Amino acid sequence: MRQLISSENTMQKTSFRNHYVKRFSSRQASKSRKENQPKRVVLFNKPYDVLPQFTDEAGRRTLKDFIPVQGVYAAGRLDRDSEGLLVLTNDGALQARLTQPGKRTGKIYYVQVEGIPDNAALQALRTGVTLNDGPTLPAGIEIVAEPDWLWPRTPPIRERKNIPTSWLKVTLYEGRNRQVRRMTAHVGHPTLRLIRYSMGDYTLNGLDNGQWREIAQEKDR
C-alpha cells in the first residue's frame, strides 16, 4: 500500500513539474516572439471626434477607421475632442520614454483659448498652477499667431462673438489627463481647440489631418 501511494505521489509531482515546465516554456516562447518582432512606429494626425483607441462598443470613430497596422498602441492619450499627433508603437521602451513623467519628454501643443491672457496668467502657467491632482511642472508658454499649417476643424469651434480668442504654444514635460485644458481654465481662459504638434523628436510635419505614416525607428534613439 505504501509503495502504491508513493508511486501515485511521484506521478503527481512529475505531472506537476511537466505542466509547470510546459507553461514556463510557453511563456518564454511568447516573450521571445514579442522580443523578436520588428519595432514599429506609426505617426498619425488624429482628427477631431476620433477616439485614441482601435475599438469602441458605442460605434464611434476610432483609430481602426484610419490605420490598418496591427499590434501598435498609442503612446499616451489624445482626447476625442483634441487633434494632432499620436505616436503608435509596439516598442514598450519607446512608449515609456514618451509618456513616463520621469523622462521629461517635451510635448508641444497649439491651443486656441477664449480671451487674451495677460502677463499674470502667462506667468502662472509658466511657473505652474495647482490643479486638483497637484501642482503642474513649469511649462513653456507663448502667445503666437494661428499656425499657417492648420487645417479647418469639422465642426468648427463655438466662438462667442463678443469675446476675442488667442493662440498659445504650450510645451509640457508631463502628461496628465486633460492637463492643458485644465491649466488654461484655471487661469480663466478655457480651451476652444487643442492640437498636439510634437512628442519628443516626432512631429506632425508633412502629415495632413487624418493621414498616417510608418517611419523607420532608429536604434537606441
From Swiss-Prot:
Which PROSITE patterns does this entry report, sorted A to Z?
PSI_RSU
* Catalytic activity from the UniProt record: uridine(2457) in 23S rRNA = pseudouridine(2457) in 23S rRNA
Query: Known InterPro entries for this protein?
Result: PsdUridine_s_RsuA/RluB/E/F_cat, PsdUridine_synth_cat_dom_sf, PsdUridine_synth_RsuA/RluA, PsdUridine_synth_RsuA/RluB/E/F, PsdUridine_synth_RsuA/RluB_CS, RsuA_PseudoU_synthase, TruA/RsuA/RluB/E/F_N
List the protein's name.
Ribosomal large subunit pseudouridine synthase E
The species this protein was found in: Salmonella typhimurium (strain LT2 / SGSC1412 / ATCC 700720)
Q: What is the documented function of this protein?
A: Responsible for synthesis of pseudouridine from uracil-2457 in 23S ribosomal RNA.
Instruction: List the Pfam families hit by this protein, alphabetically.
Output: PseudoU_synth_2 (PF00849)
**Its Gene Ontology biological processes?**
pseudouridine synthesis; rRNA processing
- According to its UniProt record, this protein's enzyme class is isomerase
For this protein, the record's CDD domains field holds: PseudoU_synth_RluE (cd02566)
Q: Name one GO molecular function term.
A: RNA binding
Enzyme Commission number(s): 5.4.99.20
